[in-house]
Amino acid sequence: MSRYRGPRFKKIRRLGALPGLTSKRPRAGSDLRNQSRPGKKSQYRIRLEEKQKLRFHYGLTERQLLKYVRIARKAKGSTGQVLLQLLEMRLDNILFRLGMASTIPQARQLVNHRHILVNGRTVDIPSYRCKPRDIISARDEQKSRTLIQNYLDSSTNEELPKHLTFHTLQYKGLVNQIIDRKWVGLKINELLVVEYYSRQT
């Protein structure tokens, strides 16, 4: 299944706020209208919607998300929390959380078009897994810096998560540590996502 490129508002109206996909928010009351439909949601539907929320927020294909779930299952610790850490430490998401892009799709474009350096080297893979002490910066070119400055100017000035530091004048961010669960930028029940995939295999 390919990455979603359809109407974004349609998704947030059904699933709730997806800041990685779009800065738009569902209108007040739209969630209530969805909940007022006759019939109770099945457990499968609830798990499916949490999975879709995760997939659309981080801009993943179904295959990519399944791959991350499998990696998380093999790691030590809570599968759900490890899954969120893997997704949050992707380069495209780090750029988004730093404010260097307004959405994750915009961050992905910056990476694909070779505007971003990691530790002084160009990285053009959005899924690149960042690690503590990585330095994320814009290429020292006018075009790269202008693009990022435009995103910074339009950002909503949300509080920077504790695992990141950003130096605005240098267009440079630092990964301080692996993200803590409470700083994940999406309202999600990751256990339902893990349960969804457990029942599919």
Curated annotation (Swiss-Prot):
Domain S4 RNA-binding stretches: 89-169
Entry-linked NCBIfam families: PRK05327.1 (NF003717), rpsD_bact (TIGR01017)
GO CC aspect terms: chloroplast; small ribosomal subunit
Alphabetized InterPro entries for the sequence: Ribosomal_uS4, Ribosomal_uS4_bac-type, Ribosomal_uS4_CS, Ribosomal_uS4_N, S4_RNA-bd, S4_RNA-bd_sf
UniProt-recorded Gene Ontology molecular function terms: rRNA binding; structural constituent of ribosome
Function: One of the primary rRNA binding proteins, it binds directly to 16S rRNA where it nucleates assembly of the body of the 30S subunit.
Protein name as it appears in the record: Small ribosomal subunit protein uS4c
SUPFAM superfamilies: Alpha-L RNA-binding motif
Similarity remark: Belongs to the universal ribosomal protein uS4 family.
Organism: Gossypium hirsutum
Keywords of this entry: Chloroplast, Plastid, Ribonucleoprotein, Ribosomal protein, RNA-binding, rRNA-binding
GO biological process terms held by the UniProt record: ribosomal small subunit biogenesis; translation
Location within or outside the cell: Plastid, Chloroplast
Gene from which the chain derives: rps4
Subunit structure and binding partners: Part of the 30S ribosomal subunit. Contacts protein S5. The interaction surface between S4 and S5 is involved in control of translational fidelity.
Signal peptide: none
Region of interest (Disordered), residue spans: 14-43
Chief subcellular location: plastid
